[in-house]
């Protein structure tokens, strides 16, 4: 005889936030990737950041590592919270390999955009651009399912990017001076561009 164990309230909550089982473990690991580099201090950040001069000298690893280091703990924590929000909204919309492609596509678009279009930017750190790519890809999945929140998210993204391109960083993000708003635009384009060629899950949760 098969007996199913009743699902309690906490388990239902974790599942609704895409934090149950292996997804929850993966989220903790992803947050650790963003938070732990802070322990390396200024030296670690300077060794891993996007640095135009260092890249020209052949230090290509910075094209990847720059997106996982931050100015300080507050900056890393803010981006970790953004990751948790993106995870809760979108984690089940694509398979893990698809999410990896979206992440790498977003990072590549940011790197290319900064190198080719923003030559005045000497250095860059942070995950916010990549998170914008993740948000764009998840929003596209919801639009394909004709979910109402997909349209709401799409309007939010367009309005946010338009504001940033015309007026600069949002007021509540100015605590970290020098926010590179173009990274948000490039990340969005990269994430949406990759997601356009992927098949998301089509059933709503």
Map each language-model feature to its residues.
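Terminal transmembrane helical module of multi-pass membrane proteins
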Residues: 153-203
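Alpha-helical transmembrane segments that form the membrane-embedded catalytic/substrate-binding core
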Residues: 76-83, 125-136, 178-199
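Membrane-interface transmembrane helices that cradle and orient dolichyl/undecaprenyl
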Residues: 139-146
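Membrane-interface helix caps and helix-loop-helix hairpins in membrane proteins
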Residues: 72, 115-124, 169-178
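N-terminal signal-anchor transmembrane helix
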Residues: 1-61, 86, 93-96, 104, ...
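Small-polar-interrupted transmembrane alpha-helices in polytopic inner-membrane proteins
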Residues: 26-41, 83-137, 152-164
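Extracytosolic (periplasmic/ER-lumenal) interhelical loops and adjacent juxtamembrane/interface segments
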Residues: 45-72, 164-171
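Alpha-helical transmembrane segments and their cytosolic membrane-interface
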Residues: 46-50, 65-83, 91-102
